[in-house]
Design a protein with these regions (language model features):
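Conserved catalytic core of sirtuin-type NAD+-dependent deacylases
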Residues: 1-190
Length: 190
């Protein structure tokens, strides 16, 4: 937040550059498999810490983006959130109120995660009997605590990851490898 306060033009220049880089890429097999898994398991609650929007682009609806989305803006004047795939500058007006007070709808270091997103996750964690953890270090909270919470209630933890670093929870099933290789195979089995 401090960098944005000091030089919003520079921050927007960086985010516009990142949006262009991401736009050149496509969702991978893991993103598409996640969307298929959600279709087969309607009770699935999908969350991501990524801000690239690839899950939604792959067809996964209702995903909770914990850290926001690089293709959205949030107005500091009226709090309106809007999709914006175009370049943004400090002079870009908000589509809701017309004021030029937009920032990326991204959670920056030192900021709290969106309360509504966290509440939806914790509500589901209280009743779920299993959690699938995919491609994360498992060390950044609060997300690292999700598996801990499920395990505390004697739920099952299934993890897919390329490294087997120590996690603050025990896995029932650990599948070592790339999510893009493993998730599609899981979807085929369901």
């Amino acid at each position: 937040p401090q960098a944005f306060e000091r030089d919003p033009a520079l921050v927007w220049q960086w985010y516009n550059w990142r949006k262009r880089l991401i736009a050149e890429k496509q969702p991978n097999a893991a993103h598409y498999a996640s969307a298929e898994l959600a279709k087969k398991l309607p009770e699935l609650l999908a969350t991501t810490q990524n801000v690239d929007g690839f899950h939604a682009l792959a067809g996964l609806t209702g995903i909770l983006e914990m850290h926001g989305n690089i293709y959205r803006t949030r107005c500091l004047a009226c709090a309106a959130i809007a999709e914006n795939r175009e370049d943004v500058s400090p002079e870009t007006p908000c589509s809701a109120c017309g004021k030029a007070r937009l920032r990326p709808d991204i959670v920056w270091f030192g900021e709290a995660l969106p309360k509504n997103v966290l509440q939806a996750i914790y509500d589901r964690l209280r009743s779920c009997d299993a959690i699938l953890v995919v491609g994360t270090s498992g060390t950044v909270y609060p997300a690292a605590g999700f598996a801990v919470e499920v395990r505390r209630r004697e739920g099952h933890v299934i993890e897919i990851n390329v490294d087997d670093a120590h996690k603050p929870y025990a896995n029932d099933i650990y599948l070592r490898g790339r999510a893009g290789d493993i998730l599609p195979r899981i979807v085929e089995l369901i």
